[in-house]
């Protein structure tokens, strides 16, 4: 069923606590050359992703590209990073359950975010615990789209260039045989970038992924 995800245990695929902290953090967007601060889940809009993902709500999200890309590509005046609005974290945030401030519950003091993350399955269950059958099902039902849209001028005329990075963690069973997990959409680019840095003549200091 298209809504079966509502009853599935939420698991972002990495540290649940860090995921909630990121979602509940204010962030920035570069607008006309100046950074503008947005609240958590600010800038809500609908975005049309390629099928089968389709139309989804997206919001501003705390991510490094907001700062790295203007430093890498000189002249950039407008830039934002938006993430699809994960419903479970959005509801947790609205209820105050992403707070790291401790509250007193009977005779115990506890941070709401620690209660939530204690109930969420650990990420290793998702990373290393998936069976081939589960991965085959995910190949057919779970999809990821990452879209980069660049607008500017080319030859004096307005120009927009769009790049789409579809689901990287498929086919799941084959990736699991090679890497031990199918969730490689963060680790594989990181490993590839590390190899590129070793092979390229790069300046000393911090190297942004955008520079590669």
Q: Where do the PLM segments sit?
A:
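C-terminal catalytic/substrate-binding lobe primarily of soluble NAD(P)-dependent oxidoreductases
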Residues: 1-212
